[in-house]
């Protein structure tokens, strides 16, 4: 009984379909790991199993559109209430409030992961593990989808379960060091 397993797939679409199934059904049902505790990693942003493609597939499967669920387009991405997102720039001046208390502070940092709790007009409210931040439209470039993130962005983070999409990355990224 090992908690590590390797699944070979012939092409990137088969790999993406398998990753979606692992997150949506197999790991939650067989290992009791909820989808929100599974992090998908990829060595690259582009290509079939890059984070851009994986994030679109995972959002469609794990957080599809629904009536009453707020959405906000930014560039090529549609942010949706319930999405997992990552702060991708240090912002020492952003105000956060601790959920359920009157505590507040300043600063969110590159690599912080949260969940969009609400989208009200142009404002997106994100919960970073109890620290709630409101993003105005001019701040949305500080957020990226985080259902899947690059191995580089995940360095130093801990997750209950990790799925590594290592199929079609650039040769210099497809090394043992990526697993480390």
Predicted features and spans:
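Conserved helicase motor core of P-loop NTPases
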Residues: 1-106
């Amino acid at each position: 009984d090992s908690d590590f397993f390797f699944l070979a797939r012939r092409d990137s679409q088969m790999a993406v379909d398998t990753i979606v199934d692992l997150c949506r059904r197999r790991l939650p049902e067989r290992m009791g790991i909820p989808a929100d505790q599974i992090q998908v990693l990829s060595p690259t942003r582009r290509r079939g199993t890059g984070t851009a493609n994986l994030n679109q597939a995972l959002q469609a499967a794990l957080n599809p559109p629904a009536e009453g669920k707020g959405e906000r387009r930014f560039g090529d991405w549609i942010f949706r209430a319930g999405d997992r997102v990552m702060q991708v720039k240090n912002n020492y001046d952003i105000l956060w409030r601790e959920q359920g208390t009157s505590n507040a502070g300043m600063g969110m940092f590159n690599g912080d992961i949260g969940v969009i709790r609400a989208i009200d007009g142009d404002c997106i409210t994100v919960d970073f593990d109890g620290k709630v931040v409101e993003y105005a439209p001019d701040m949305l470039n500080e957020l990226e989808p985080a259902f899947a993130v690059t191995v580089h962005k995940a360095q130093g983070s801990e997750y209950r379960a990790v799925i590594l999409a290592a199929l079609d990355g650039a040769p210099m990224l497809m090394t043992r060091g990526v697993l480390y």
